[in-house]
Amino acid sequence: MKKIEFELHYQAQKALHACIDKANRYFQHQFPMPLLSYQLRGKAAGKAYLQLNQIRLNPILFKENKTAFLEEVIPHEVAHLLTYQLYGRVKPHGAEWQSIMQGVFLLPANTTHQFAVASVQGKTFQYRCQCREFPLTIRRHNKVLRNEASYTCQKCRQTLIFTGIQLS
């Protein structure tokens, strides 16, 4: 387990088991229990690894949004795994996934979360051209530093220059 308290992990496992139990009853089928991991970074709340039957949760967002994770994010990701196991490769938030969210879990088929992401935002760096300033992510900033990429303003077509300022 990565950076997650035992009690929170226990609650996540309980929610996961409840989702699989609901699906087993609904479809009259025995679905394998997914593996739960907390190795997701960035702004994503959760991610389903279909062929591994694994769900990865963002531990920082989970700690900040416990109830929403237990009631919405975990069922959302379980629905992806169930969709894959029942229908194979289909659109990630297509009709099959929506029917599982609404029919099995009785939840709205929301495709994105509305969590505050400031705590997982990552570093940004200020770049400028002739007409304005741009925040670049650490990934893009590092590519510029290694001469692997350069970025151009769409408006004035000038190459962006690092100002020396780290924004966050």
Curated annotation (Swiss-Prot):
GO molecular function: zinc ion binding
Encoding gene, per UniProt annotation: sprT
SMART domains: SprT
Organism, scientific name: Vibrio vulnificus (strain YJ016)
Protein family: Belongs to the SprT family.
PROSITE patterns according to UniProt: ZINC_PROTEASE
Record's keyword annotation contains Metal-binding: yes
GO cellular component assignments: cytoplasm
Cofactor: Zn(2+)
Cofactor binding mode and count: Binds 1 zinc ion.
Residues where Zn(2+) binds: H76, H80
Name of protein: Protein SprT
